[in-house]
Amino acid sequence: MTIIRKKHPLIKIINHSFIDLPAPSNISSWWNFGSLLGLCLIIQILTGLFLAMHYTSDTSTAFSSVTHICRDVNYGWLIRYMHANGASMFFICLFLHVGRGMYYGSYNMIETWNMGIILLFAVMATAFMGYVLPWGQMSFWGATVITNLLSAIPYIGTTLVEWIWGGFSVDKATLTRFFAFHFILPFIITALVLVHLLFLHETGSNNPTGLNSDADKIPFHPYYTIKDFLGVLILLMGLMILVLFFPDVLGDPDNYTPANPLNTPAHIKPEWYFLFAYAILRSIPNKLGGVLALILSILILALLPLLHTSKQRGLTFRPITQTMYWILVADLLILTWIGGQPVEYPFIIIGQTASIAYFTIIVILMPMAGMIENNILDLD
């Protein structure tokens, strides 16, 4: 068995990636989220495949086909809710994975980090298009509002929006193409994940100390396969509690009303995992400015290697930057809350303050804290 594992041209790639991979001996449970994201992707592809067998991407039957899946298909309700709540678990793992990378300075592995940002954009695009497919009220109006943002692009904006819509409004052509893209993107994401792993295995994993761990490595299997399996059990338990007890808690009640272009919902809002970016978008009165802020709220992650001023890699031994980091986490939670609130006083001013704080902490305060900590270290 060992000979096959180490000599077979295909199996040896798997062996070097998941079995004999040298891993730092001290990586904590924060390093579990990569494998959990892989599991989420597999769950989403499998449940999505079975949903696609029964779904019809036509405006007149899309809503009914989703109802049919829940009522008439064997365990259709389970597949549908696993897919919908699986997306939420996916984003929880994604945010924790990115947060871990920011905390421990993993962004210094630039190729892996940039690949991760591309993956984040791809997953967000996939989730947005998936939300449109049930063709409920929030699906329709969410699609209308978000695609309309592209009209803020000077000169080509309006043409671009109509090109994406396939007409002069969100209609049959839009739904069909969104279904096509929503189906193909997870497979593209899978390919990007392999590239992400390829870059990661070029440098090896980071660790909580931020120090070089070449002198102290252990094989991935059995140590981290067992450790990851515990994470898998916790994730699956969390997902099944959501699916079986609170399947609609993260959804919007408006999406149980079929799409009606003549009736606008009181508050148009995306799924919870986009609310922080939506709050940043809404906090700027200018349309183009809002769109740029929206894109920058994610793209700013690409600047982190340039904004790294500390002599140390992670925040493990840096209390000032740690404080800034946790204020940033609290700020993101405030933005998420504001994104789900109506556009009125006092939510407008809270959103604007939180948006300014978000960019200020990342671009100014954290790099400054790094320099202050360097000076404190030099004082000895």
UniProtKB/Swiss-Prot annotation:
Topology versus the membrane: Multi-pass membrane protein
InterPro entries hit by this protein: Cyt_b/b6_C, Cyt_b/b6_C_sf, Cyt_b/b6_N, Cytb/b6-like_sf, Cytochrome_b, Cytochrome_b_C_euk/bac, Cytochrome_b_N_euk/bac, Di-haem_cyt_TM
A single GO molecular function term of this UniProt record: ubiquinol-cytochrome-c reductase activity
Subcellular location, principal: mitochondrion
Places the protein is found: Mitochondrion inner membrane
Protein keywords: Electron transport, Heme, Iron, Membrane, Metal-binding, Mitochondrion, Mitochondrion inner membrane, Respiratory chain, Transmembrane, Transmembrane helix, Transport, Ubiquinone
Pfam families documented for this protein: Cytochrom_B_C (PF00032), Cytochrome_B (PF00033)
Segments passing through the bilayer: 33-53, 77-98, 113-133, 178-198, 226-246, 288-308, 320-340, 347-367
Domain of life: Eukaryota
Binding site for heme b b566: H97, H196
GO cellular component, one term: mitochondrial inner membrane
Binding site for heme b b562: H83, H182
Keyword match Transferase: no
Cofactor binding note: Binds 2 heme b groups non-covalently.
Positions of disulphide bridges: none
More about this protein: Heme 1 (or BL or b562) is low-potential and absorbs at about 562 nm, and heme 2 (or BH or b566) is high-potential and absorbs at about 566 nm.
Function noted in UniProt: Component of the ubiquinol-cytochrome c reductase complex (complex III or cytochrome b-c1 complex) that is part of the mitochondrial respiratory chain. The b-c1 complex mediates electron transfer from ubiquinol to cytochrome c. Contributes to the generation of a proton gradient across the mitochondrial membrane that is then used for ATP synthesis.
Assembly mode: The cytochrome bc1 complex contains 11 subunits: 3 respiratory subunits (MT-CYB, CYC1 and UQCRFS1), 2 core proteins (UQCRC1 and UQCRC2) and 6 low-molecular weight proteins (UQCRH/QCR6, UQCRB/QCR7, UQCRQ/QCR8, UQCR10/QCR9, UQCR11/QCR10 and a cleavage product of UQCRFS1). This cytochrome bc1 complex then forms a dimer.
Protein name: Cytochrome b
Organism: Alticola macrotis
